[in-house]
Swiss-Prot record:
Signal peptide: none annotated. Keywords: Cytoplasm, Gluconeogenesis, Glycolysis, Iron, Isomerase, Metal-binding. Homodimer. GO terms for molecular function: glucose-6-phosphate isomerase activity; iron ion binding. Pathway: Carbohydrate degradation; glycolysis; D-glyceraldehyde 3-phosphate and glycerone phosphate from D-glucose: step 2/4. It catalyses: alpha-D-glucose 6-phosphate = beta-D-fructose 6-phosphate. This is Putative glucose-6-phosphate isomerase 1. The gene is pgiA1. It comes from the Bacteria. Belongs to the archaeal-type GPI family. It comes from Rhizobium meliloti (strain 1021) (Ensifer meliloti).
Amino acid sequence: MTKLFEPAGCRVDLRTGAMSDATGAYQKRFRDLAGLYADEAAFSAMQETWNDTVVYEVSEFRPNERTGDLIFGVTRMLPGKVGEEYFVTRGHIHKQSDRPEIYYGQKGRGLMLLESPEGEVRVVAVDAQTVCYVPPYWIHRSVNIGGDELVMLFCYPADSGQDYDCIAKAGGMRARIIDDGRGGWKQIDNPNWRMRDAATVAALYGREKKEENA
């Protein structure tokens, strides 16, 4: 007999970015984000006052990690910059890389910075009442470009998993988002980014597993 999970409803507090009845949560403090930003001197200078500050936090509802179910939750992210570069999340690709994700902006002004395994770059706005679709196979990272907290709801297949190392191994994401000096933002190249070799690209597409099972 099939065991059914209980339906659930979770309330989001836009003031705090908290979600009721979450099954789990985690925080990333400023010190946890070392190495993400181009201006290492600016990061070091900010550590004295920012080191223990929670830059972003996630609360989630995770019924299980089986194929066919969903994980959803809320990310709350502070506004700020390191040098000229806006605050970002660590970013990831899904371990099951053919799994998509949806983000729904609830408060603030944000961007989703996306990168294909080959290095194509896309930027999608995630403002309040904006839905952002992250297709399968795209590495993605959230950016807060506003002066207020960024609050986003997310939802993805329960068996997706996350791979954070793919960004670090490439020297970061190919693009960075910085203040344009006119109240907006602009995209610049990351000179430390390294193109992935064919084997790494194939692995990110999950081709190795498919070939083994063929």
